[in-house]
Amino acid sequence: MAVRDGGGSAPVGSQEQAVDRVRETVARSRRYGAVAPETVRRLAERALVASRGDEPEAVKRTKRSLHEIYGAYLPERAPGYPGLLRDIGAAVGGGDPDAVAAAVSRAMRVHASTRERLPYLREFYAAVFGAVPTPAVVQDLACGLNPLAFGSMGLPAQTTYLASDIDSQQMEFLDRALDLLEVEHRVEVVDLVSGAVPAQHADVTLVLKTLPLLERQRAGAGWELVDALRSPFVVVSFPTRSLGQRSKGMFQTYSAAFEAQAAERGWTFDQAEIANELIYIVRR
């Protein structure tokens, strides 16, 4: 028998079943099948409320939300991860550093965020890691394909790299690619908005172009994440142009928001702007 709350709302059991149906429908789609179930379920719950229980509409809303936070950064066709792994493996086996760098760059072009950063990759990481003590452990949250840039970060070979995101196929690819590149690492699938903040200590945590996406899903989620991190240094960045290369006053909006939050928490920080990215290196 379904359990009802005291306010005459729909039966709890039927609500949960509706969420499951929406989640399962979205998960069967080719584009979003690899997304963490927690992410899809959370967005499905919100979509069902917004659509007043209309399940087909909730499926559309869930896919739209996934596009905004995930799908827009990837190509329309599924990334060719097996071929990219073969290219990286062949380049590593050939022993030519230039060939390895070229194969890694081709892989990084699959994701919009890393593709945008490629022209100034070394400059970007010189600014980041030149401002902090040399880390033994780096954590990269909502990482996309950013861990592939390890060779451009100027870090010691023995550095441990912890990477997480919501795409299980992407994380499997990174795990195998970082093995080939001989980077000490651990990868996991994590939905940051659900409160699954990694508990491990890291000397530096990267949260690159991520806070606006978390805040879009739930107000306060991004700042709660940063507060919960076990890192003395946190690198937060914001895009200053959209994927369509429009500025929309993004620098002013994000800089004002960040600096207000930093003042409230008593953080000290360095600021840099490189190409279309506003960077804050926070000491806590």
UniProtKB/Swiss-Prot annotation:
<dbReference type="GO" id="GO:0046677">
    <property type="term" value="P:response to antibiotic"/>
</dbReference>
<comment type="similarity">
    <text>Belongs to the methyltransferase superfamily. Aminoglycoside resistance family.</text>
</comment>
<feature type="binding site">
    <location>
        <position position="165"/>
    </location>
    <ligand>
        <name>S-adenosyl-L-methionine</name>
    </ligand>
</feature>
<protein>
    <recommendedName>
        <fullName>16S rRNA (guanine(1405)-N(7))-methyltransferase</fullName>
        <ecNumber>2.1.1.179</ecNumber>
    </recommendedName>
</protein>
<keyword id="KW-0698">rRNA processing</keyword>
<keyword id="KW-0046">Antibiotic resistance</keyword>
<dbReference type="InterPro" id="IPR025981">
    <property type="entry name" value="rRNA_MeTrfase"/>
</dbReference>
<dbReference type="Pfam" id="PF07091">
    <property type="entry name" value="FmrO"/>
</dbReference>
<feature type="binding site">
    <location>
        <position position="142"/>
    </location>
    <ligand>
        <name>S-adenosyl-L-methionine</name>
    </ligand>
</feature>
<feature type="binding site">
    <location>
        <begin position="191"/>
        <end position="192"/>
    </location>
    <ligand>
        <name>S-adenosyl-L-methionine</name>
    </ligand>
</feature>
<keyword id="KW-0489">Methyltransferase</keyword>
<feature type="binding site">
    <location>
        <begin position="111"/>
        <end position="113"/>
    </location>
    <ligand>
        <name>S-adenosyl-L-methionine</name>
    </ligand>
</feature>
<keyword id="KW-0949">S-adenosyl-L-methionine</keyword>
<feature type="binding site">
    <location>
        <position position="208"/>
    </location>
    <ligand>
        <name>S-adenosyl-L-methionine</name>
    </ligand>
</feature>
<dbReference type="InterPro" id="IPR029063">
    <property type="entry name" value="SAM-dependent_MTases_sf"/>
</dbReference>
<keyword id="KW-0808">Transferase</keyword>
<feature type="binding site">
    <location>
        <position position="117"/>
    </location>
    <ligand>
        <name>S-adenosyl-L-methionine</name>
    </ligand>
</feature>
<feature type="binding site">
    <location>
        <position position="217"/>
    </location>
    <ligand>
        <name>S-adenosyl-L-methionine</name>
    </ligand>
</feature>
<dbReference type="GO" id="GO:0008649">
    <property type="term" value="F:rRNA methyltransferase activity"/>
</dbReference>
<dbReference type="InterPro" id="IPR010769">
    <property type="entry name" value="rRNA_MeTrfase_GmN_bac"/>
</dbReference>
<comment type="function">
    <text>Specifically methylates the N(7) position of guanine 1405 in 16S rRNA. Confers resistance to various aminoglycosides, including gentamicin and kanamycin.</text>
</comment>
<feature type="binding site">
    <location>
        <position position="73"/>
    </location>
    <ligand>
        <name>S-adenosyl-L-methionine</name>
    </ligand>
</feature>
